């Protein structure tokens, strides 16, 4: 009986030690800040990979602010939360692309949708051509990087053709 009791105590002690080692190991995983992470990124492809792998569309935030423009999140906040909606993703992409390489000349683009539910994306230039980054939407048909385009009007046509519910954009312009 004493032998079984000793074995049970030893087993409990070992299990507790393993559990404590596991907890301390998890606590030691370094979490990089926005600044640290972006300083390691070299091209727009690094941002694309992060957006595709780590960023998610915030459905609850989208529903809460549907039809209005919510208070935009900072790039740091979007990075930390790893989620957002159209305006958050556009601001994050613009700030990040311009930090990676100012020659991208990233800008926020607004698509004016009849009925007032505007959509925001990020444009950037590469080799003199226009590209659009859009991760702030639940519609997979328009998520990602699109282009090259010769103009915003050309992207507008792409958007109208590929968006599953919006088939007419009233206007498209750069946000000032």
Regions found by a protein language model. Name each.
Residues 26-176:
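A structural boundary/capping signal
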Residues 1-11:
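N-terminal secretory signal peptides that target proteins for export/translocation
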Residues 17-24:
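Bacterial N-terminal signal peptides
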Residues 15-16, 30:
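Intrinsically disordered low-complexity regions specifically enriched for long asparagine
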